Each structure stands twice: as C-alpha cells, then as structure tokens.
Amino acid sequence: EELKNAVNMTQAESANGIIIDPNTGDILAIASIPDFNPNNYYNYNLNSYKNRTISDSYEPGSTLKIIPLISSMKYNYDIENKKYFCENGSYNLTHINKLNDHEPHDSLSIKDIFIHSSNIGISKIVNEMNLKDIYQLCLNFGFGTKTGLPFKSESSGKLRSLSNWSKTSKTYISIGQEIGVTNVQLALAYAAIANGGFLLKPHIIKSINNNHKNIYSRKVAPIRQIFNSSLSDTILNILKDVVDNGTAKNLNLNGYNVGGKTGTA
C-alpha cells in the first residue's frame, strides 16, 4: 500500500520495494508495481508480470557511495581525518566530464562528503584509491552476479571487467553510474552493513511442513565476510548521521534508530 501511495504521489511509471532480515537473508516482503491479479492474469500486459526487484537493474546513484566509504577504511587509506575541497559545487573531472553537487560545499571530511552526498568530494577521495580495491569490493558485495534466488528472471546486474574500465570509471561507479544493480543486490549490500559485514544468500522460503513434519528448512550461511564488525559499526553510525543531519532527514522516525542513504537512479 505504501508503494502504491508513493507511485500515485510521484506519478511514477513503476516502483519496487524489498524488506530483508539482515541477520538471516530472509525476504520478509517484496512488491513490484505495476502488478497483476493471478486469477485473471490474461487481462494484463506482459510488463505487469515482472518482479522488478529481481529482474530490473539500474544505475543506483548515490546509494553506491558506500563503496568508496568502505574502501577507504577496509583498505587502510588513512584519509579519515583529511578534508577535501569540494569546489563549491562544480568541478571539471576531465576536459569533457563535469561533476556537479546538489548544493555547494567548500572543504569536507570523508564522513561529511557521504552525509551531504557530494559527488565532487567522492571523486577527490577515489582519486587516491587503487582501481582494483574498488572493483574487488564491488565483486565482494555480489554486484554483477545473481543472488541465487530461484527465479529464471533474476538479473545479474552489470559490472564490467576491470580491463574495460576507463580512467574515470572508478569515480562514476563510486557515485552509482556505469554499473547496474538490482534492488535485491542493493538490499543485501546494506544488510551486510547491518549484520557485521556478511553477505548473505537471500531466502524466500523459511520452511516447509507436511502433516506436521518438517521437510525443508532454509540454512543461514554467509557467502562471505566483506569487512569486520568494527567497520560495520562505524558505517552504521555514518548512515544514522545521514538520516539525522544529512540528505535523508525525511526518514527520521522519532524513537527509532534509522540509518540510510539517498540516491537518484
């Protein structure tokens, strides 16, 4: 219902949403609009049959700024206390590539760059990073790979091999461009931040019982640990600051600890 309300309010052509338990990978809710009634499916066009949460990949925008943020700490770039000049909102990355921020900033720390979602600040940060570190972190998060859900329509997203990256790719991928992800991939990435750094396999079925006899129970088994719990706690606090003081203030719920990141796909 909330998804439908959002579609009506924004007049969007489509929308999808997913809720995952970050400790188990269980998919608690999943929705895609437009949808259809299976009792009279023949009255709908093929576009309504898609579960966009798993079948559609898109450029995730600033939600992927977790990549340079985590990279800076995971690979010990020692830039946590540095400040970066954000060019007051406009910056020529190359003679043909220009970056703009949604609001002008002077100099910001890496934490404030993330909180205020500065594209220019991100470009300055990744300029000090190894291309392979950013690529490897994308791989570790599972981008470019199917999650293993039992649906033939699942998309693997799009992550080009490192040999096909240009000189500006590490900047554009770090601001969520030149890469395609599905919403389930992105949800699992943020779940890893919430659970101590573990990428989990998603589950749509928790158990199956027949005549009170259990014939199937899903097993919670991490695919890999991407980073340690200490780094996870640090990122969670920064995500909370995004909601409390940054671009996601509208997500602030009194009485609840909420963390998040805005992004324009």
Predicted regions and their residues:
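Beta-lactam-recognizing serine transpeptidase/beta-lactamase-like catalytic domain environment
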Residues: A15-I18, P22-S62, I67-A265
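Conserved, well-ordered alpha-helix/loop/beta-strand core segments that scaffold catalytic motifs
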Residues: E1-A15
